[in-house]
Amino acid sequence: MRLPLPVSRVTQNGRPGYRWGESGTFYGYTPGNEASRARAEARATRQGQAARAAGYEEPTFTPPASVAAAARRGLALREAQPPSNKAGTAVGIARARDLANRRPLSVDTLRRMASYFARHEVDKEGEGWGIDSKGYQAWLLWGGDPGRAWVNRQLSNL
């Protein structure tokens, strides 16, 4: 599946700039200088367009069945809860749908998932962790333990 190569605003060594996709060149600009910012964005955009024209595609990763199953369990568990106990942000629910449907994910999405798992690993040690807890529901929405293991494995191979 071909995913778009977006131009995004990034920071490198404390300097603002633009980059397309995950592997594009960093084009820095001078803060407060609109002309410099516009040039950097235009250069990154042109590089992305040239890469697309040459047939370049960013790598994608299809979630395995175990991750899809965990996300489906999370969605089902969330649906079975009363409104006051439904977990998951809009982003978490969207991620669960992508995982459950085994949609290809970008490297950037894998990194966001790894960040989620790193931040929320401690939730598992909290009181009340279990099938009815919001933390458990949210963990499953992001793919659960199989998701964490898969994401870490994919990122370590890059």
Briefly describe each language-model feature range.
Residues M1-L158:
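Arg/Lys-rich, low-complexity, intrinsically disordered basic segments
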